[in-house]
């Protein structure tokens, strides 16, 4: 095989390795994002349940505010 053929095969191999590495990185990032979304949902659900339980004892409503959920006689917005 000539030197040009070897260089061409080497180049193709490098391109293949680089693209498969990028695909693996994108897949890993997607999985990481999915895990973060699940954690946020479970945390939000837990906070909301606690808020509803606490507000129910005070006979108030659990309202979402800028500072997070809080108890109020009536929710606005």
UniProtKB/Swiss-Prot annotation:
It comes from the Eukaryota. Keywords: Amidation, Cleavage on pair of basic residues, Disulfide bond, Knottin, Neurotoxin, Secreted, Signal, Toxin. Residues 1-22 form the signal peptide. It is found in: Secreted. Expressed by the venom duct. The modification Phenylalanine amide is found at residue 76. Belongs to the conotoxin O3 superfamily. This is Conotoxin ArMSGL-0143. It comes from Conus arenatus (Sand-dusted cone).
